[in-house]
Amino acid sequence: FKYGDRTYNQVKEGMKASKTKNQFFQQYVGTFLKEYEGVKALQLPKQYKFPKQPNLMQLYVAYKTKQLPQFANFSEPGSGKTLSAVLASRIINSKVTLVLCPNSIVEQWGNNIKEIFPDSEFVFGNDIFSVKYDKSKYQYLILNYDKLNQAESLARINKLKKLKIDFIILDEVQSAKGVANISSKISRRTNLMKLL
């Protein structure tokens, strides 16, 4: 996408010049053009304060999330997934976003969210389970995966399910596997599925 506009224009011109009746080709190219136009038309929220503008991939993730709420971004590490996830949450106007991540990066998520959208409120730790929905705020509940395999996890998950969660971000989803808690025989993955 580095040369996005140039590529787009070349594809558009090539489509006009092409006399092919190949439906697959027409659909494939048509989808590319439609999605590219949708991404380019995306307006950043006024509250966006991150020093760098999002790249085309990050905008594409936000665009696709708006089109397909179950869209998942499995890009490589370092590709800007955090920015794309936070941006997507605002593009869809999520008032309560649940971020599930490893314990080691809970604070980092909070810092990143504040850097991108300073008007955000974030909560982590046990305070998450007493949050009230407030449509005047953008709230991010940052929960580490370890909270999903504790004795009280099921009761906490039920509290979260009653809260209107608009968007869920699963960071480093491989951490959701966990090991079953021997005493309760409840795994992170099982509790995660109950939450979703």
Q: What is each residue range found by the language model?
A:
Residues N73:
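Hydrophobic anchor at the beta1->P-loop junction of P-loop NTPases
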Residues T31-Q70, G78-L195:
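SF2 helicase/translocase NTPase motor core
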Residues F1-E35:
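Charged, low-complexity intrinsically disordered regions
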